[in-house]
């Protein structure tokens, strides 16, 4: 949909996922906040992020290798076709390897200590929190010792319970999670 206030927008199951008017703020902040904690940018993993904005930002930050785990290639195709400025055809870049299917199944075969950064760009609903919590051991296993996991946790003012749930998941595994 092309919304007057937000520009071209993607809706899935009646929920807005991304809008061209403010996507850059989201993706640049999302990737940049992790880089403020760890400047290493050799390898990144993206879990979700079908619109391509996080992949675009990882490319712009000169990550050498980006593994993008996305469940639904159709979402990426639709975004490339209708919201092309967001992902800038990130799937066609040599530094990006797309792994289609269940990300949490796919990462089970990844070597330990592989990624400097893991960007978890899933929906901000309880299902995704539970899914990430169930698979946090796998995420921690593939993260380098000084690596950083950055997650889309939702809005503190609109979904405070979900934000608290995410913080509990991270504090249980790391003990040092902050907003």
Regions found by a protein language model. Give the residues of each.
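The AdoMet/dcAdoMet-binding core of the Class I SAM-like
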Residues: 21-173
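A short glycine/small-residue-enriched secondary-structure motif
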Residues: 9-10, 27
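Short strand-turn-strand beta-turns centered on an Asx-Gly dipeptide
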Residues: 12-14
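Short, isolated positions in well-ordered beta-strands
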Residues: 17-18
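N-terminal auxiliary segments of SAM/dcSAM-dependent transferases
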Residues: 1-9
């Amino acid at each position: 949909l092309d919304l007057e206030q937000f520009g071209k927008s993607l809706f899935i199951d009646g929920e807005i996922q991304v809008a061209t008017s403010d996507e850059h703020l989201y993706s640049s902040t999302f990737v940049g906040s992790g880089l403020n904690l760890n400047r290493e940018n050799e390898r990144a993993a993206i879990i979700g992020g079908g619109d391509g904005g996080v992949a675009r930002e990882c490319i712009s930050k000169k990550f050498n290798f980006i593994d993008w785990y996305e469940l639904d290639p159709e979402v990426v195709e639709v975004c490339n076709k209708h919201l092309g400025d967001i992902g800038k055809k990130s799937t066609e870049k040599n530094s990006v390897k797309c792994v289609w299917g269940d990300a949490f199944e796919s990462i089970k075969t990844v070597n330990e200590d592989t990624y400097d950064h893991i960007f978890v760009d899933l929906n901000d609903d309880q299902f995704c929190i539970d899914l990430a919590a169930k698979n946090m051991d796998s995420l921690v296993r593939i993260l380098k010792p000084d690596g950083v996991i950055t997650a889309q946790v939702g809005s503190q003012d609109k979904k405070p319970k979900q934000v608290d749930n995410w913080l509990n998941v991270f504090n249980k595994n790391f003990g040092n999670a902050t907003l």
